Amino acid sequence: MKPISFIIPSRNNLKYLKWCYNSIRKNLGYIHEICIADDASEDGTWEWLQDISKKDLGVKIHRNKGPERQGLVVLYDKLVKDYSTNDVIMIFHADMYACPGLDKALFKHLKKGTIVCATRVEPSLHPPGPEKIVADYGIEPEEFDEQKFLTDLNNFRDKEKITNGIFAPWAI
């Protein structure tokens, strides 16, 4: 399998970012690169990123010192252009959980010139859409019912459905 560069900007979202990082490493292993940008956070994100990048050589970090935010789009571009080294790019949010087999499922559908979106599973906080499954496994990382989610994962209807919806997470 080819390695993926996960592109993750974050601002003052440390507990979610840790949860996201841990899900990638736990469920997908260390083959994939994780490129993370801190957008002038004040919650300890930069200090945690410095620590984790010393322990995990597959993590590349960038910091916007601020005081002004740069925003997601600028930081996505920065991470893709200056930090990612793989042919496949996965646009991810700091509050997303990487399911077991996400990488294999992406490569099953990814062809040259296409964009593949993973299905989002989230509680009914936002309007429904074709690209997501509405289900509640907890909103905060400490509330996340991982065991129930993983048990239900294989039973989701339409998990192989192809839609025209596009929203992160997506890979190119």
Q: How would you describe each model-predicted region?
A:
Residues 65-83:
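Glycine-rich, basic loop-to-helix element that forms the pyrophosphate-binding segment
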Residues 93-97:
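The conserved acidic donor/metal-binding loop of glycosyltransferases
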Residues 151-172:
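A recurrent flexible, glycine/aromatic-enriched loop bordering the glycosyltransferase active site
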Residues 101-118:
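Conserved donor-nucleotide/metal-binding helix-loop-beta segment in metal-dependent transferases, i.e.
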Residues 116-134:
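Short beta-strand-to-loop element that shapes/binds the nucleotide-sugar donor at the catalytic cleft/hinge
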Residues 89:
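Short aromatic/hydrophobic "clamp" motif used to bind/position activated sugar donors
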Residues 22-31:
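Short, acidic, metal-binding catalytic loop of nucleotide-sugar glycosyltransferases
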Residues 38-47:
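A conserved acidic beta->alpha catalytic loop
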